[in-house]
Amino acid sequence: MCDKSKENLRQIKSYVQRAGRVTKKQQQALDNYAAKYLIEYAKDRKLDFTEIFANTNDVVLEIGFGMGGSLVEMALANPAKNYLGIEVHKAGVGNILYEIEHQNIANLLVMSHDAVEILENMIADQSLASIQVYFPDPWHKKKHNKRRLVNQTNIDLFAKKLKVGGVFHYASDWLPYAEEVLELLENDSKYRNLYSGFAPRPEWRPLTKFEKRGQNLDHPISDILFEKI
């Protein structure tokens, strides 16, 4: 892909910033807990994970955590890992801030900004143990496919930020999107499939709202796990 095409893809957002309803509890969490658990975007600042988490544990990045329920569950189940979640919608950010405070979660921090810009400008190369993208917007219409978060440009970006041996984990209930991602990764020499084709659903991945909705619609659930080599 030429540099100009890559630049055009970077400028296309994978999300639409909607003014969704924020509950009183969520707004109070945004007002009261953002200073403690929400990292502000700063283009010229690289995150020092040892400093912000106060340990040297592996860091897992989740892009698009929604309301945050599954990410909270994973952080609580894995106290020896650090989790950084990215979500652009205020309701989800407020919800997870409330949970972090009231469940006293020490290994989870969040950001609310474009994930690609965070990765490009604030995440050091080879610093992440895992990148998780669960049930991203599939942008069903062909004319909107270019908005999909997981494309070749971003797969290249993920590889830069993952440590050698780090894992990219993608899950979707939209098979055409999952097949596209699988093909891109299978043909990328920077990655190795940890399974043959799609992975079995990991028991440790919590059930999400979008996964439940997909199951109710009889959509097949696809997990993909690739290791950076």
Curated annotation (Swiss-Prot):
E.C. number(s) listed in UniProt: 2.1.1.33
Cellular component, GO, one term: tRNA methyltransferase complex
One Pfam entry name: Methyltransf_4
Keywords recorded for this protein, A-Z: Methyltransferase, S-adenosyl-L-methionine, Transferase, tRNA processing
The UniProt record lists the keyword S-adenosyl-L-methionine: yes
Class in the EC hierarchy, top level: transferase
InterPro entries tied to this protein: SAM-dependent_MTases_sf (IPR029063), tRNA_(Gua-N-7)_MeTrfase_Trmb (IPR003358), tRNA_methyltr_TrmB_bact (IPR055361)
Binding positions for substrate per the UniProt entry: K141, D173, T208, K209, F210, E211
Binding residues for S-adenosyl-L-methionine: E62, E87, D114, D137
Region: Interaction with RNA, residue numbers: 143-148
Entry superkingdom: Bacteria
Family label: Belongs to the class I-like SAM-binding methyltransferase superfamily. TrmB family.
Functional summary from the UniProt entry: Catalyzes the formation of N(7)-methylguanine at position 46 (m7G46) in tRNA.
Stated name of the protein: tRNA (guanine-N(7)-)-methyltransferase
Species, as recorded: Francisella tularensis subsp. novicida (strain U112)
Recorded name of the encoding gene: trmB
